[in-house]
From Swiss-Prot:
Family of the protein in this entry: Belongs to the CorA metal ion transporter (MIT) (TC 1.A.35) family.
Name of the protein in question: Zinc transport protein ZntB
Subcellular localization, as worded in the UniProt entry: Cell inner membrane
Taxonomic source organism: Escherichia coli O6:K15:H31 (strain 536 / UPEC)
Gene behind the chain: zntB
An MF annotation (GO) of this entry: magnesium ion binding
Keywords per UniProt: Cell inner membrane, Cell membrane, Ion transport, Membrane, Transmembrane, Transmembrane helix, Transport, Zinc
Coiled-coil regions, chain positions: none
Amino acid sequence: MEAIKGSDVNVPDAVFAWMLDGRGGVKPLENTDVIDEAHPCWLHLNYVHHDSAQWLATTPLLPNNVRDALAGESTRPRVSRLGEGTLITLRCINGSTDERPDQLVAMRVYMDGRLIVSTRQRKVLALDDVVSDLEEGTGPTDCGGWLVDVCDALTDHSSEFIEQLHDKIIDLEDNLLDQQIPPRGFLALLRKQLIVMRRYMAPQRDVYARLASERMPWMSDDQRRRMQDIADRLGRGLDEIDACIARTGVMADEIAQVMQENLARRTYTMSLMAMVFLPSTFLTGLFGVNLGGIPGGGWQFGFSIFCILLVVLIGGVALWLHRSKWL
């Protein structure tokens, strides 16, 4: 591969443009720098910025189909070999505080032995871990190590989010044992988050597995083994997601049963109350007709005796319901 001049990739509004120093650190890219396999360049762009979009559309360093892919709409994770380079699309957890984490952020990467071009629109939180290591001098030393570290950070964040969802399910199951029903829509949102994670993490696991199996010239055998470990770790996370989805289905049935039992209990209570007061309602209605005068209306103790009879009648009905084991 021919060397690349720093001026060819120094985009003014880039998120950052760095050169890997080969010792785990980075330095800012200068126009006079020479980019080769010993000192690769990492160019990170926000493709909606004007200068970045113009560079992506006009640079001769990228194949034509790569330009469109790096600035296109979000797609599912995939990997494509394009001559000496590789185009990779990955998804990561959304770290923005005003959006849901399951609204995954897309990151697209084109890389060969000399150049790493990564693009995004929303911030990729997992890259902060890689950037921190590079600034401390403990980061990757080449393109293969960079890709492994990025995939490892993405998987760490995904695993943390899956663990958070798992903890929510455990709390929900404990509450259901105490007959506590979650707020409306809570279980549906939880299930949607699991399904979205399953949709994107499954192909991302396949991307990791393919990167581990293919003989990329800029990846060593040790880096391929690490990539396979990352794929296996994400696969275990997918197994956890599948188990959580099944558990949410069981909980939905349990919630429906609890609500049905509560409704039946309330209906039964109202029916018993109607049975208790039905005889007294009949008598008060009968006396209230008053077609031929109220019986005992002229007697000073008539109303009191009538009230006592109603209380005795209600007590008798309640006693009968209790002995019949209805109450």
